[in-house]
């Protein structure tokens, strides 16, 4: 289910826009995730107390974590599917320490797509959206495979 060179180019083009302001993109992705799927907030001890969007926007920790998430994802996307070395430790920590189910990876992928649509409509047309969806699905499938190897049923 790999992506063509052209699809990877579409993914990386829009990702360049994300990298121009990783903290605000990451913050918006997490806020959308937590507002749309409040159950995901329970996995984050640091953020459980944040109930309103205003509280989330004011949280430097949330902004920092959003930047961490998108920086890691950017490193994976730049590998164009050759991301075994990046996926392994990420799956290890998300399966054994954080216990993040694959379903939550789907939910954050949806939030990423929504943020890209909102912030970069001119650079994120149907072709770019399709390519990004494929890239995120590849990431999730590889995370799920590692989870399985680790015996995590998430």
UniProtKB/Swiss-Prot annotation:
It comes from the Eukaryota. GO terms for biological process: removal of superoxide radicals. The keyword Heme applies. InterPro entries: Globin (IPR000971), Globin-like_sf (IPR009050), Myoglobin (IPR002335). GO terms for cellular component: extracellular exosome; sarcoplasm. Keywords: Cytoplasm, Heme, Iron, Metal-binding, Muscle protein, Oxidoreductase, Oxygen transport, Phosphoprotein, Transport. It holds the Pfam family Globin. Monomeric. Belongs to the globin family. Monomeric heme protein which primary function is to store oxygen and facilitate its diffusion within muscle tissues. Reversibly binds oxygen through a pentacoordinated heme iron and enables its timely and efficient release as needed during periods of heightened demand. Depending on the oxidative conditions of tissues and cells, and in addition to its ability to bind oxygen, it also has a nitrite reductase activity whereby it regulates the production of bioactive nitric oxide. This is Myoglobin. The lineage of its organism: Eukaryota, Metazoa, Chordata, Craniata, Vertebrata. The gene is MB.
